[in-house]
Swiss-Prot record:
Residues 1-11 have a biased composition (Basic residues). Residues 1-60, 116-143, 156-186 are annotated as: Disordered. Residues 21-32 have a biased composition (Polar residues). Has a role in cell separation, a final step of cytokinesis and in the assembly of the forespore membrane. May have a role in the transport of secretory proteins to these growing sites. It comes from Schizosaccharomyces pombe (strain 972 / ATCC 24843) (Fission yeast). PROSITE patterns: T_SNARE (PS50192). Residues 203-265, 356-418 form the t-SNARE coiled-coil homology domain. One of its GO terms (biological process) is Golgi to plasma membrane transport. One of its GO terms (molecular function) is SNAP receptor activity. Keywords: Coiled coil, Phosphoprotein, Protein transport, Repeat, Transport. This is Protein transport protein sec9. The modification Phosphoserine is found at residue 141. Belongs to the SNAP-25 family. One of its GO terms (cellular component) is prospore membrane.
Amino acid sequence: MKKLFKKKKGVSPHMYMLPEESNSNTATNAPSYSVGGTTANSYSSNSYNDNNNSNSTYGSSNNYGNYGSSNNYGSYGASNTYGSNGSSNNYGNYGATNSNGDAGYSITPIRNDPYARKDMPPMKSSAAVTERPSMHRSAPSQDTLDLKKQELFAGARIQNDDESTTDTIPHNDDGTEGDEYGEGYRDGYEEDQEVEAIKQKIQFVKQDSLSSTRNALLMAGNAEQMGLATLANLGEQTEKIATAEKELDISKIHAKRAEEQARELKTLNRSMFAIHVPKPWGKAKRVAAEEARLAAKRDAERQDEMLNRQFAYRSQKRIDQAMKDNMKSNKKKGDSKGVSILERSHYQFEPDAEDDAMEKEIDGNLDQIGALATRLKGLAYATGQEIDSQNARLGSIHDKSDRLDTDVYLNVERLRHIH
């Protein structure tokens, strides 16, 4: 193989050796790289040729276009293409590809190149390449792009919000904020809130009033029932008082009769030598006086009986009248519908079916409460009169009972002295 090729000046014989015949200790040549669309490679094809050779088998061809250059090597060479946006180095079997983007570059070193120069400084490892300051700027990640988009659109949204806020707030000619729309809108909103608050308050007051009227009606009905029951009890008590007074009058009569018999018994119980002879003169007068006394006694008894009956009758009449008045007032229905319709508008903000029903029920409850109050007044008046009448009769009974007690005590003492 050495005979086929002649050694030329400036060309290393090792560069024409096959890969198998190359020295195993050949160091890795330095990588090729490009910056800004120009080729910067100290060990590229120009270093191995005296002149620019094109289409050589093992030579190199440099074709520079408008935006870069293209180096085409043979089977073991490399091709560097510089386009408008970067470069691409295509090597053969033992080559590497360098891709340059818009900004910076990337380097892929060629290791163990059999055609590299012997006199180039060997590279110990791939770390030597990585130690070089890389000017390649890696492509931004998706998170970085999302952050940048958010920043961009956030600024746009902030600007739009500022513009919309500025547009919605009216300004006067002097640059100050106007009150034609903003304050009018706020005032309208506040008025709506006040109206809603008033409506809710009216509704609450109506419900409270309805509940109060229902409770008052229930309590008034209970009071009426208790008043009627009390009046009925007073009627029964009047009858009992009249009966007690009648029995007291009868007891008084028996006490008077016992007094007479005790006096007669005393006369008959005298000594047997004391002869009792009635006086012969004045007999008619004595008889007339006795009859007058008995008549007066009977008249007093009759008067007491009549007073007792009058007391019972008047008491029953008062009770019956109170009952009749109560029933009559209960059956009477006041027609206040027209007045309620006229006055209802003063208490309604937005009348509807529910509101009308509430107002109607409130009016009805108030009417019933008024009627119940009237009936309760009648019951209270009748009850007061009945209690006063009973108190008077009870006072009379107290006096009669005291006199009867005195008469009974005297009769007992008279009988005790008879022996």
